[in-house]
């Protein structure tokens, strides 16, 4: 692939790691963010200490606070901003774009209020005149491992297989590999909802439960993610792939996962506001729990784990009681998909 110019919007942990992957592949990478001190640090010290204490970035990676400069004459734009500001940033990009680009996103969440997936937001806010079909970059990936060039396999999903293949070539190298998929609904739904299950898995650990319980919540969590995804139009096979069970395993079993750590703290009795303050990073699983619960209620989809987490976070229920209540639910077949 010839050298591409790529704007990465969002210099958080994942945005920074993906910027490094793209830089390793010989592309011109421009990181954009709105925290002046952070951008200056990346440009002068070539570090991003808030997220990576011992990592030095390549000096060729340039960071910007001016969005217009960051996206000027680029071939593609990668959104890696929190769900809650995706629409705002997309509006800003739409007002500045002067040529057609490939639009990608690597965030995982659902918009509160509208319940929309992030690709839908980008489609709504950026005119088709200035963009490709949206490409979703998602899968089992800790930024802490990708940044040290550990082997990582994820998915590039788009309704346009040509766009997905472009992104596959853009990122893939000897340690980072992408597989294509056309099931955007499934890939995005899996990526968003696994954060809820990760909160639950962390809570089980914080409460002192063992591996049996953790395996149970991951597998039954996958079942309810699939139930909702299929109801929304996803291909059930997607949930057995990298962006489904793969992402659920890595997020639901690792201390690298901020959602798992948040759940662990909840299980140990910490208050949510203290957890969010101490972590200093966005915990997408918290807001996604509310959105997923509302969607499930509207569509009458059985999601007991999501409901238990919702009641604990938003209704003040005791997390242990909420989990134990599931043990007295009506008996069901393992293969019920409704």
UniProtKB/Swiss-Prot annotation:
Kindly give the InterPro entries that the UniProt entry links to this protein: 6-PGluconate_DH-like_C_sf, 6PGD_dom2, G3P_DH_NAD-dep, G3P_DH_NAD-dep_C, G3P_DH_NAD-dep_N, NAD(P)-bd_dom_sf
- Keywords tagged on the record: Cytoplasm, Lipid biosynthesis, Lipid metabolism, NAD, NADP, Nucleotide-binding, Oxidoreductase, Phospholipid biosynthesis, Phospholipid metabolism
Q: Where in the cell is it found?
A: Cytoplasm
UniProt catalytic activity: sn-glycerol 3-phosphate + NAD(+) = dihydroxyacetone phosphate + NADH + H(+); sn-glycerol 3-phosphate + NADP(+) = dihydroxyacetone phosphate + NADPH + H(+)
| EC annotation from Swiss-Prot or TrEMBL | 1.1.1.94
Q: Does the keyword Nucleotide-binding apply?
A: yes
**According to the lineage, what is the superkingdom?**
Bacteria
Q: Give binding positions for NADPH.
A: 13-14, 108, 143, 258, 282, 284
PROSITE patterns recorded:
NAD_G3PDH
Active site at which residues?
194
Which residues of this UniProt protein bind sn-glycerol 3-phosphate? 108, 139, 141, 194, 247, 257-259
- Tell me the enzyme class: oxidoreductase
Biological processes, Gene Ontology terms: carbohydrate metabolic process; glycerol-3-phosphate biosynthetic process; glycerol-3-phosphate catabolic process; glycerophospholipid metabolic process; phospholipid biosynthetic process
Q: Name one GO molecular function term.
A: glycerol-3-phosphate dehydrogenase [NAD(P)+] activity
Pathway annotation from the record:
Membrane lipid metabolism; glycerophospholipid metabolism
Gene Ontology cellular-component terms listed: cytosol
Q: Describe the task this protein carries out.
A: Catalyzes the reduction of the glycolytic intermediate dihydroxyacetone phosphate (DHAP) to sn-glycerol 3-phosphate (G3P), the key precursor for phospholipid synthesis.
PANTHER family per the UniProt record, alphabetical: GLYCEROL-3-PHOSPHATE DEHYDROGENASE, GLYCEROL-3-PHOSPHATE DEHYDROGENASE [NAD(+)] 2, CHLOROPLASTIC
**UniProt name for this protein:** Glycerol-3-phosphate dehydrogenase [NAD(P)+]
């Amino acid at each position: 692939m010839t050298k591409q110019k790529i704007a990465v919007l969002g210099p958080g942990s994942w945005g920074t790691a993906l910027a490094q992957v793209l830089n390793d592949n010989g592309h011109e990478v421009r990181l954009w963010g709105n925290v002046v001190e952070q951008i200056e640090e990346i440009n002068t010290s070539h570090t991003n200490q808030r997220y990576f204490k011992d990592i030095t970035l390549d000096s060729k990676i340039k960071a910007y606070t001016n969005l217009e400069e960051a996206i000027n004459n680029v071939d593609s734009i990668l959104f890696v901003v929190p769900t809650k500001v995706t629409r705002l940033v997309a509006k800003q990009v739409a007002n500045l774009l002067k040529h057609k680009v490939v639009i990608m996103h690597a965030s995982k969440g659902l918009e509160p209020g509208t319940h929309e997936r992030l690709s839908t937001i980008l489609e709504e806010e950026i005119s088709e005149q200035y963009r490709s079909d949206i490409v979703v970059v998602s899968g089992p990936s800790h930024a802490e491992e990708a940044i040290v060039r550990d082997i990582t396999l994820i998915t590039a999903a788009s309704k346009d297989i040509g766009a997905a293949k472009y992104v596959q070539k853009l990122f893939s190298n000897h340690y980072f590999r992408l597989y294509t998929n056309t099931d955007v609904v499934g890939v995005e739904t899996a990526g968003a909802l696994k954060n809820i299950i990760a909160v639950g898995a962390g809570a089980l650990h914080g409460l002192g439960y063992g591996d049996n319980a953790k395996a149970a919540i991951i597998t039954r969590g996958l079942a309810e993610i699939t139930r909702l995804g299929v109801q929304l139009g996803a291909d059930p096979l997607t949930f057995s792939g990298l962006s489904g069970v793969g992402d659920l395993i890595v997020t639901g079993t690792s201390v690298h996962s901020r959602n798992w750590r948040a759940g662990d703290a909840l299980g140990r009795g910490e208050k949510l506001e203290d957890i969010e303050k101490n972590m200093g990073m966005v915990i997408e699983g918290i807001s996604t729990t509310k959105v997923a619960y509302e969607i499930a209620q509207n569509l009458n989809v059985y999601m007991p784990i999501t409901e238990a987490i919702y009641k604990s976070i938003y209704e003040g229920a005791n997390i242990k009681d909420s989990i134990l209540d599931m043990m007295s639910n009506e008996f069901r077949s393992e293969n019920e998909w409704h």
